[in-house]
């Protein structure tokens, strides 16, 4: 049975590190050629390509940037680190980051199920803003009561070395680790800008939660659930 609409949540990560020269960077657009540099991005890209081969199948693809909010663990690790007085960053080249709060992704999924113009198309999702590499950690620090924080910035080669060692050792031990070469590629990417105007036009998508409010809600949830 063919569904009336299939919404696939892909990722901005399918594009890898593109449009990183010159600075200021240009937003990644749907017309750009995907160049995934992680297993996660490659899997999403392969799924997108498969959907495009299915005949008479009404699909819509959503490509959110970094999704955060209640229950999300990667950004929780950052919050936990800041509570413990350490903020670790890598790379000295400017980094433009984008985010989307989880409820805005839900909004987009719902709208994609209804919008006829969206069938067989792919759309980026973010909150429509671009942030520097300190924005998220500074907001976390504020919501955690402004604890003193030691800001450490390491060169990319150091991150790559740590991720390579961690990934190799944990692979030998049969353990999963978030510090691997895929994580290196994600953290080292400098340009996470994306163009959400097509989503606004075709889906009627409009971000409701900007970063300051989203971080406030996230930290509140982490505290309520005993994560922080």
Briefly describe each language-model feature range.
Residues 17, 35-62:
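Active-site Tyr-X1-5-Lys
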Residues 111-178, 212, 216-217:
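Mid/C-terminal beta-alpha module of Rossmann-like enzyme folds, strongest
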Residues 1-39:
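Conserved Rossmann-fold NAD(P)-dependent oxidoreductase catalytic core, especially the SDR/UDP-sugar
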Residues 102, 138, 163-171, 175-206:
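Conserved C-terminal active-site "lid" loop/helix of NAD(P)H-dependent oxidoreductases
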Residues 42, 46-47, 72-77, 91-113, ...:
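Substrate-positioning beta->alpha
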Residues 15, 57-77:
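Flexible, glycine-rich beta-alpha linker
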Residues 194-202, 206-228:
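Amphipathic terminal alpha-helices
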Residues 27-33, 79-90, 146, 175-179, ...:
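A short C-terminal helix-loop "cap" of Rossmann-like NAD(P)-dependent dehydrogenase/epimerase domains
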């Amino acid at each position: 049975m063919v569904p009336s609409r299939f919404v696939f949540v892909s990722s901005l990560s399918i594009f890898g590190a593109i449009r990183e020269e010159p600075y200021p960077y240009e937003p990644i657009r749907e017309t750009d050629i995907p160049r995934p540099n992680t297993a996660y991005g490659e899997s999403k890209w392969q799924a997108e390509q498969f959907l495009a081969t299915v005949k008479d199948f009404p699909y819509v693809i959503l490509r959110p940037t970094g999704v955060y909010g209640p229950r999300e663990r990667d950004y929780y690790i950052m919050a936990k680190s800041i509570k413990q007085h350490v903020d670790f960053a890598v790379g000295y080249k400017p980094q433009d980051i984008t985010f989307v709060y989880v409820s805005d992704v839900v909004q987009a999924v719902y709208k994609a199920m209804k919008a006829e113009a969206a069938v067989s198309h792919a759309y980026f999702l973010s909150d429509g803003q671009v942030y520097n590499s300190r924005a998220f950690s500074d907001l976390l620090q504020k919501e955690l009561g402004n604890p003193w924080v030691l800001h450490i910035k390491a060169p990319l080669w150091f991150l790559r070395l740590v991720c390579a060692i961690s990934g190799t050792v944990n692979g030998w031990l049969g353990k999963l680790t978030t510090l691997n070469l895929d994580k290196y590629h994600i953290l080292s990417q400098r340009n996470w800008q994306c163009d959400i105007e097509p989503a606004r036009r075709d889906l009627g998508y409009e971000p409701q939660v900007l970063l300051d409010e989203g971080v406030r809600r996230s930290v509140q949830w982490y505290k309520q659930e005993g994560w922080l």
